[in-house]
């Protein structure tokens, strides 16, 4: 929410991400810089992918009072995988922190915790939630076989895997760093449950190995 700065210098974005950033920051004058560069004198803000800003860049931005725009995939990203270079339909742009980073607050977190919501907006959000569930909309919207709950009354627990080098593990789950450790922790917490393990779609597609 809000107006993006007029002059934004973006660091370390690959060419295909540059194309998307131009769309999402339409109205801002964008200049793309190498990862090890520093903002020029006309910059009003710097943009980086996730938590990849180098310490020197962060220090320079703070010293000059420049806004830091941290960019990441949105929760409803695309029809297809980002690792397969499918263009996104949503990105998150946050000036405070990343939603997956448990070590720092984010604009999204603050907005949800302290914001006030008109009844009409709450009703719209609920209608959208119902529509997403009914139409089985997911982050990547990949085709797949249907799943049926196992027979009986046994508790079923979904265990969602991740690419183990992903920043969400580094900053969001300091006590669990591998998918195997995650499964072991869930089994210890749910000894009688039926566990369903869902590997990350990038791993299933062969675009990343689990530990990459």
Spans of features found by a protein language model:
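Catalytic-core helical/loop segments in enzymes performing group transfer/polymerization on anionic/lipid-linked
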Residues: 1-212
């Amino acid at each position: 929410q809000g107006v993006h700065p007029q002059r934004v210098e973006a660091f370390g974005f690959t060419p295909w991400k540059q194309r998307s950033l131009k769309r999402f920051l339409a109205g801002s004058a964008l200049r793309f810089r190498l990862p090890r560069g520093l903002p020029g004198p006309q910059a009003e803000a710097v943009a980086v992918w996730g938590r990849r800003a180098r310490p020197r860049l962060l220090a320079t931005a703070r010293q000059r009072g420049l806004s830091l725009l941290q960019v990441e995939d949105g929760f409803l990203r695309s029809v297809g995988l980002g690792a397969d270079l499918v263009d996104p339909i949503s990105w998150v742009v946050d000036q405070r922190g990343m939603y997956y980073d448990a070590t720092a607050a984010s604009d999204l977190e603050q907005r949800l915790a302290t914001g006030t919501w008109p009844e009409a907006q709450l009703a719209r959000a609920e209608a959208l939630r119902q529509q997403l569930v009914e139409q089985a909309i997911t982050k990547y919207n990949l085709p797949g076989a249907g799943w049926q709950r196992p027979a009986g009354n046994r508790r079923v627990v979904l265990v969602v895997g991740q690419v183990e080098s992903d920043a969400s593990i580094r900053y969001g789950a300091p006590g669990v760093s591998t998918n195997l450790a995650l499964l072991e922790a869930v089994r210890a917490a749910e000894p009688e449950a039926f566990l369903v393990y869902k590997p990350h779609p990038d791993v299933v597609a062969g675009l990343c190995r689990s530990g990459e």
